[in-house]
Amino acid sequence: MPLVNGRFVADMKSPRTPDNEEPAAERACDFRPVDKGFTEEMALAEAERCLNCKKPFCVEGCPVNINIPRFIEQIREKDFGGALDTIREDSMLPAICGRVCPQENQCEGKCIRGKKSEPVAIGQLERFLGDRPELASTPVSYTHLTLPT
């Protein structure tokens, strides 16, 4: 990725990484999830597409204000544990939000890349990390929670 004015800049021509879906013939025979989520290689390729904007509108589009540029940069650096920790600073549900959050109207809807081409697949990157809790440098503790009586 080229360095311009002290910032890494992505190639605008790189296409969005397609979803990792079960082939139709296979999914017709079972009840496994259709979308298998990104592999590590797919996540790294998609993270390279981030423009590292000076004013990250994607964060403004996120209802919980996740530091999206930082976690994508950490994915790019293969610091998956750090990326998951970054998300968990604001959201403890990356695996769920990566699947059900309406990213097309929120973070991805605000992505600058989406003005000229397809936005970065922020939801898929979040899901990639959320599906791998063992990568976190700090394990999640729920001991502080109390059940209602």
Language model features with spans:
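Ferredoxin-type iron-sulfur electron-transfer modules and their immediate structural context
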Residues: 1-141
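Conserved small/polar residues in nucleotide/adenosyl-binding loops
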Residues: 143-149
